[in-house]
Amino acid sequence: MSYYAFEGLIPVVHPDAFVHPSAVLIGDVIVGAGVYIGPLASLRGDYGRLILEAGSNLQDGCIMHGYCDTDTIVHENGHIGHGAILHGCVVGRDALVGMNSVIMDGAVIGEESIVAAMSFVKAGFQGEARQLLVGSPARVLRQVTDQELYWKRLNTKEYQDLAIRCRTGLSETKPLTQVEENRPRLKGTTDVKPKSAQ
């Protein structure tokens, strides 16, 4: 694991969280219970405080950072998709930030909201609960439906379960040189499907 103290501040990681060995946590970072942090995530707590609350996830290649005297927060069960950037913002409880989205300083994503993939949320945006945000710059398209929120929660549950699975089932290894006969497929825990398959 890549943990670095910075000017006396040491990252805090709950023992029930999973942090991939290639992720980097620097300084003022606080990671709650059941959190999943994916490969190559960068959490630079060298200016502002970075907080991932219980049950949230920060997937592969995500970046968290913020200015001095600010908190960048992903609240409980927040879901941050691959490659997203969070800078000095707040992501509400049970909200989802889609892949490769950018959330800027002082922005607040309301609880149970969804930010569509590739969206850009401008600095200072103040969201409300259950908003679907789309575009660059992001605009409120409509309210999140019950079906969309259910789908989001299933995906978040998958990552909460993945944190548990990775703590016991992930190990560094050498690759095989050929595909074995009857190679098994991995399964999730919730049977969640991509939105395109619904």
UniProtKB/Swiss-Prot annotation:
The keyword Chaperone does not apply. One of its GO terms (molecular function) is transferase activity. Pfam families: Hexapep. Residues 179-198 are annotated as: Disordered. Residues 180-198 have a biased composition (Basic and acidic residues). The keyword Repeat applies. Keywords: Repeat, Transferase. InterPro entries: CaiE (IPR023446), Hexapep (IPR001451), Transf_Hexapept/Carb_Anhydrase (IPR050484), Trimer_LpxA-like_sf (IPR011004). Pathway: Amine and polyamine metabolism; carnitine metabolism. GO terms for biological process: carnitine metabolic process. Belongs to the transferase hexapeptide repeat family. Overproduction of CaiE stimulates the activity of CaiB and CaiD. This is Carnitine operon protein CaiE.
